[in-house]
Swiss-Prot record:
One of its GO terms (molecular function) is cyclic pyranopterin monophosphate synthase activity. This is Cyclic pyranopterin monophosphate synthase. The gene is moaC. Homohexamer; trimer of dimers. Its EC number is 4.6.1.17. It comes from Haemophilus influenzae (strain ATCC 51907 / DSM 11121 / KW20 / Rd). Signal peptide: none annotated.
Length: 160
């Protein structure tokens, strides 16, 4: 059975020692879905939101969040990310925005939390910028899509 890596033999939370691990190329992709009204999505897509470019702001927020994950999530290592990408895709038929993030580095620990944080904060930024026009926006399906590198190998999430 696999054990929790952040719990020591006394049952206490601690930061994992990665000093003996080999550096490998590591990559992770994550996504979040933001559901809103047709009117709110149209306002964003048509560039008519009074706060400015919602997608550009959410993209930058997601990138910044990935870089600061270690400050937000206890026990995460500070990482020297080599790439962070955040893409936002309006899904007009379902009144949703699909956010997908990619994080990459060559290092001793994975970038799953950075990718998940990027997608999550981009989604939260959309909510923040749009809450004045719609309070019941829903953020859902935040999940890891894929990870590679490291001893646990390659993971690809099942399609939803």
């Amino acid at each position: 059975m696999t054990t929790f890596t952040h719990i020591n033999s006394q049952g206490e939370a601690n930061m994992v020692d990665v000093s003996a691990k080999a550096e490998t190329v590591r990559e992770a992709r994550a996504e979040a879905i933001v559901t809103m009204s047709k009117e709110t999505l149209s306002m964003i897509v048509e560039g008519k939101h009074h706060k400015g470019d919602v997608f550009a702001t959410a993209r930058i927020a997601g990138i910044q969040a990935a870089k600061r994950t270690w400050e937000l999530i206890p026990l995460c290592h500070p990482l020297l990310l080599s790439k962070v990408e955040v893409n936002l895709e309006p899904l007009l038929e379902t009144n949703q925005v699909r956010i997908q993030s990619l994080c990459k580095l060559t290092g001793k620990t994975g970038v799953e939390m950075e990718a998940l944080t990027a997608a999550s904060v981009a989604a939260l930024t959309i909510y923040d910028m749009c809450k004045a026009v719609q309070k019941d926006i829903v953020i859902e399906h935040v999940r890891l899509l894929e990870k590679s590198g490291g001893k646990s190998g390659h993971f690809i999430a099942e399609e939803k």
